[in-house]
Design a protein with these regions (language model features):
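A compositional/biophysical signature of low hydrophobicity enriched in polar/charged and small residues
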Residues: 1-79
Length: 79
């Protein structure tokens, strides 16, 4: 499994609607509102980095109310 966190900035006062839509995507395991620089923290999990990339670029970044995203890919193992 490939894991990533996406930090989302969205338009003002639409955070709940964006979170609700994010939760409809299969790869999204959690979507929560935050205070600070970013509005939403999204935890994603997929079978491959290609599938994860597709969700981020073709779904999340193309949402009408999403302004910007920052993606953090997780290192699976340290040896």
């Amino acid at each position: 499994m490939v894991l990533a966190f996406v930090l989302v900035n969205c338009e003002m006062r639409v955070e709940k609607a964006v979170i609700d839509e994010l939760k409809t995507f299969d790869a999204v395991k959690e979507a929560i509102g935050t205070f600070g620089v970013y509005d939403i923290l999204v935890k994603l999990e997929a079978d491959s980095d290609h599938k994860l990339r597709d969700v981020i670029t073709q779904k999340i970044r193309k949402m009408d109310k999403v302004r910007t995203t920052t993606t953090l890919m997780i290192i699976q193992e340290w040896e």
